[in-house]
Amino acid sequence: MASPSKTGECGDGEEIEALDSVHVDTLLKAVENAGQKSGCTIRIFEKNDFYYFFQSDADLAASFTYGSTAALKTMGKKTPVSFCVMNYSNFESLLRHLLLVRAFRVEIFKFLAGKGGSVPSYQLEVRASPGNISAIEHILYGEGGEGEQGASESNFLVAIKVIPGTDSGQLSLGLAAVDVSLNVVRVADLQDNQHLPALEAILVQLGPREVLLPQTESAAVKKISELVSRNKILGTERPSKEFSSLSETEINRMFSSKSNTSELVKSDSLSCGALSSVCKFLNIDTATTSTKFYLEPLSSSTTMRLTGRTMKSLNVFPSPTNPNQPSIFSILNQTRSPGGGRLLSQWLKTPLLDSVMIKERLNLVELMVTNTEMRQLLWEDHLRKFPDFQRLSAKFGSSKATLQDMYKVYVAVAKLEGLISCLQDHNGEEADNFVTLQDNFIKDLQEANKDFEKFQQMVETTLDLKQVEQGHFMIRPGRSQ
């Protein structure tokens, strides 16, 4: 049994919490009470920022964190159980690896001290999966939601509802993709054949880490499950009843007034049933939610259809297990912000087919490449303080934004006039270049600059900007909260 009184070591001399006999018994009982689990689920037991892993989970944790299983210890007298323990810093790295690279599900149990004569215990506090990371996003990406690893990626959770068609081999599919970190929903109703080329193209386009499928013995669902697995995506079965459609009232409550929900509310919309499944999985109460989502179109008809094998053979993106591997994305990714990284990723996943759109995009790229002065000004000055607006917008929409988030937006908005002037002064000699810049950037930036005038005034009269310079984000004295 582990030492009952002394602080021990794990891995490379890492100090771990002392284990007494009472805590050992509590841990072993918690492991037993947690019951059976799948091989794709990792259970973690936390007390005072120390994290315990048992049996096969301990093998995996020790191998990743310490490079071998030599760090494993055992606890228990009658039936010794192998375990591994680590501090928060190592847990943070391991959690990213488990969810973002290995696509495991994670359950975290929190220690509860006994009160009023009750015995201490462990209680399930967090259940996360690759497509449901909102509860631990601050660990994966940092408190600001803009950590380097993964911040430039979308994190869509996808659900698929399927009905076999009348023609042999034809399928009717409804797909819903939700990214709660961006408050974005994308839906599609499509017809596909038994080889599922249209579905695979959309999955490549979205790049989800997890897909929800109805729990059924249907041959069609089995084929979709095989496709999901082949593309290294975690497939999760959910009860078929969760795929029942949302009501029109629920849809209107869920989406912003700018979202066109006319197709979604149709009675024959399979994507509405898929969206219902995602909402239930993410615990989004569609009857009472105050968070407003943005509905975006999802289609593969205007872009080249790519398969997972094509993306891999062309080495478009680095392997999740080897992020430093050279790839097309890593060569091209000289973006200044996480939002820019997401846009580049989307461009690579969805090559255009329309010649007019291709020409416009190439004109933009050529303008940036040939105009060195403008490119350097944008990179070194105007875009330097730009935060991840999409994630911040979602935080404001969910009433989770802090004073620091407000200040980040304020600083970025203050740079808009200079950014607009830079684009206007360096639009090139050709008229087409000016029109392209106007339509793609300048008009929208001018509109945003005007819209944020009152926001700037509010920040200047509400935040104590002198304290902000010292790193303290506070309301001005005399102002109400």
Where are these regions (language model features)?
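Basic, polar low-complexity surface loops/patches
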Residues: 1-349, 356-373, 381, 388-394, ...
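A short structural micro-motif
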Residues: 353-355, 416
